[in-house]
Amino acid sequence: SRSSGGSGRSFYGDCGGAWVNECASLVPGTARAHRRVSAETSIKRFARCFGVPYTVLRIPGIYAPDRAGGTPKQRLERKTPVLVPEADVFTNHIHADDLARACWLSLVGRASYAAVNVTDDSDMRMSQYMDFAAAVYQLEKPPRMTREQIQAHLTPMALSFMQESRRLVNTRMKTRLGLQLRYPTVREGLTQIPQPFHPSHR
């Protein structure tokens, strides 16, 4: 038998836009991140105690064009602001269909005791992502604000995503899980028609 679980990536902390792999130190900066570190640690201890191979999938922002609320469209319609260029952060994304395939592969693939970043190859700042989505949906680009200005317009949860900047390395996902991204970046993911999931499609 095997064990697989989903986790987050916020416990990497703010890395100033640097590339981060699974061996990086965990520096949780929020209560939510601390809870995720605790949960991931518990999974690892349980699996090792019983000799069960496990994979912990570290998952960034999930999007899904075929599901309600699964894209930035509603944020654009609400004119939700983003940060000015000098303060902007790198974000990480994964299409829901690619995530489903990663989950499948983590359960049927080679035995492993590891964490795996499950993210695409987008390499985009948040404003670039939102600007591209605006072009796709033929909406206005989001307004830009400084960190001080934007605090009055966003929830604490939304603000927390703008306080950390990092780019996740996905080499382990491609080599250890063997996942070939169907949607390599959000450019394909937001514009292509979703295809039915089948386990044999890596």
Predicted regions and their residues:
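Amphipathic terminal alpha-helices
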Residues: 184-202
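Glycine/proline-rich active-site loop of Rossmann-fold NAD(P)-dependent oxidoreductases
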Residues: 37, 50-52, 62-74, 79, ...
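Active-site Tyr-X1-5-Lys
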Residues: 27-55
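A conserved pocket-lining segment of Rossmann-fold NAD(P)-dependent short-chain dehydrogenase/reductase
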Residues: 74-94, 98
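Conserved C-terminal active-site "lid" loop/helix of NAD(P)H-dependent oxidoreductases
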Residues: 131, 151-180
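Conserved Rossmann-fold NAD(P)-dependent oxidoreductase catalytic core, especially the SDR/UDP-sugar
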Residues: 1-31
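Glycine-rich "substrate-gating" loop/helix at the edge of Rossmann-like oxidoreductase active sites
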Residues: 28-33, 60-66, 85-94
